[in-house]
């Protein structure tokens, strides 16, 4: 079946599985980059505790780079899918070209931060000179060579918007394999390659990302024939850029809020470096689980957006129903794994002094995964139906308005010696349940105003 006919005619439940599985694998493999780095770094011969803490502190900026790339891609994904659903191939070409122009701007910003801002950022979270040195070296490499992850994210969404998510997954798998092969070689030093420690982990990561980006560029040029490829479409078009960000600026802010939340949590936990490291390690496991929901969201959004563009009320409703159902199934599996095997994850990272904090965080915070996954699915639905502001509100509730004040208040009692660090972890389930209730109310309103009103 042709790609355009598939988006129009294939039963939504089958289409979501066919598109969703490659996207889920792709997102999961993005999380693998950070897990693999931490696992190898945690088993270094010396300085592993400081190195793990350093990776925890740099993680918010890594997330922010991914967030801006993916956020720009998600908004362009919805707009491109809707435009193709309307049969407007010329506008689709402009959307694709302008997204690449925006990618170049994003890279320049990351490059400048990598050169001038990294050390000050790391120093704001710790006073340990070894951690500052390791974190600065790692993050500078990731920022200066960030064009790989930025353009991978953009080409990934271009392929997903046309229903070719399998090819984006192939590129991600190749990059992940390169990263996994290079990590022990460059961290520990094997053969002619010298031991580079944390720097080696950074180089392995960015090389894998660059390989993925190159491969997806080739796939995009060869396979995406629904619209023209020409550098003339990269010329900035104010109307297209405004339309992209009218849909997706809330999505970028939502993604960036994840980085802000982790950074502020690092500051809240600054009183205990072991708890700080434990949270950073757990967040990478949590990200792996929630990236399953993000991957499915990236199938939900173009399917519903395409259906919205062709005014198919039935396919929109099917997209909402199956999107939520499949998300819940994935999150139940994630909760089961993290609740049953916390000790095994701690051993993978060689968590050391952070072990008990890590296990405690995993057992408590993983309770929230089901509600967090539903919230992610809600946001994909909102974005497909021009509900960018609703998506932003859910993100603000989850990652700023509720979670940070709660964690800060709970930390006051922990620092006073009244109760253990586990109290802080309970802020996460409370936040996700509250946001899920609000998200359901938003969904009912959008369904009434956007879906039921279609002719």
Q: Which positions does each model-derived feature cover?
A:
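Transmembrane helical elements of multi-pass membrane transporters/channels
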Residues: 18-37, 141, 175, 208-212, ...
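Helix-terminus/linker motif at the lipid-water interface of multi-pass membrane proteins
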Residues: 28, 32-53, 122-129, 185-196, ...
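Short alpha-helical transmembrane segments in multi-pass integral membrane proteins
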Residues: 1-20, 80-147, 193-248, 304-368, ...
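Small-residue-rich hydrophobic transmembrane alpha-helices
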Residues: 52-112, 149-168, 278-342, 372-386, ...
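N-terminal transmembrane alpha-helices
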Residues: 7-47, 60-75, 79, 104-111, ...
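Transmembrane alpha-helix boundary and packing residues in multipass membrane permease domains
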Residues: 23, 27, 39, 78, ...
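Small-residue hotspots at the loop-to-helix junctions and early N-terminal turns
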Residues: 49-60, 135, 139, 273-288, ...
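Short runs within selected transmembrane alpha-helices of multi-pass transporters and secretion channels
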Residues: 70-73, 142-160, 168-176, 201-216, ...
